[in-house]
C-alpha cells in the first residue's frame, strides 16, 4: 500500500529550509511529542527547542534542529513550521555544536551574577538539539 504524502515547509526569517513532500513528521511541542501523518486534523502548536524529524517520500529519515521560538501549523494536506532558526542535520558542524554546549554548561555552573541564566539555558538547549539532530542523521547513514 502506498504511503500518503503531504507537503512540509520549514521556514525561518532568512530562508525556506525545506519544502517538499513527506510521509510523516515527529516534533516536540509544548504539550509533548507529536506524530503527524497525511490527513491529520488541523492544529497549531508551539514547538520546543528540540530535534524535529520527518520521513521523505523516498523513505529517508531527515533530522532538523529547531531553535528559538517556533510554531507548527497542521492542515490535512500541509504542515508549516515557522521558527527563528532551523538547520538540516547535514548543515550542522557537530564539533562546533559540542563546543557551544560546553560553553553553555560552563556559564550555567559559574556563580557570576552578571550571567543571564535563561539565555544560557536556551543556548544549552539549542546546542543539545543541534547535537541530537546531527547524531541521529549520522546513525541513520
Curated annotation (Swiss-Prot):
Q: Where in the cell is it found?
A: Cell membrane
Pfam families, per the entry? ATP-synt_DE, ATP-synt_DE_N
The gene that this protein is the product of is atpC
What is known about what this protein does? Produces ATP from ADP in the presence of a proton gradient across the membrane.
Give the family from UniProt.
Belongs to the ATPase epsilon chain family.
- Alphabetical list of InterPro entries matching this protein: ATP_F1_dsu/esu_C_sf, ATP_synth_F1_dsu/esu, ATP_synth_F1_dsu/esu_N, ATP_synth_F1_esu_C, ATPsynth_dsu/esu_N
Query: From which organism does this entry originate?
Result: Natranaerobius thermophilus (strain ATCC BAA-1301 / DSM 18059 / JW/NM-WN-LF)
Q: What's the protein name?
A: ATP synthase epsilon chain
- What membrane topology does the UniProt entry give? Peripheral membrane protein
Question: Keywords on this record?
Answer: ATP synthesis, Cell membrane, CF(1), Hydrogen ion transport, Ion transport, Membrane, Transport
One Gene Ontology CC term in the entry: plasma membrane
What are this entry's molecular-function GO terms? ATP binding; proton-transporting ATP synthase activity, rotational mechanism
Q: Does the keyword Cell membrane apply?
A: yes
